[in-house]
């Protein structure tokens, strides 16, 4: 399963921190940010994960995160 999210994270350091946190929360998932894209893309790939968990982790820190349609 691959899910793509739109975020407002524009800082590389923050993106790295969130990637580490998401990998801990979602074992076995690959997490990658593309901050060059205008939507500040977050891509999560794994066999089983709940997209709402990704949104929760990001939004709990005050950032926006939504599934990109």
List the predicted regions and their residue ranges.
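Short glycine-/aliphatic-rich beta-strand segments at the starts of folded cytosolic domains
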Residues: 1-11
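Short amphipathic alpha-helix segments
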Residues: 9-25
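Short amphipathic alpha-helices in soluble, non-transmembrane regions
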Residues: 18-22, 54-62
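Conserved short beta-strand edge segments in small beta-sheet-based binding/regulatory domains
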Residues: 32-33, 62-69
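Short Gly/Ser/Thr- and Asp/Glu-enriched loop/turn motifs at secondary-structure junctions
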Residues: 35-39
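A generic structural motif
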Residues: 40-44
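Helix N-cap motif at beta-to-alpha junctions
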Residues: 46-51
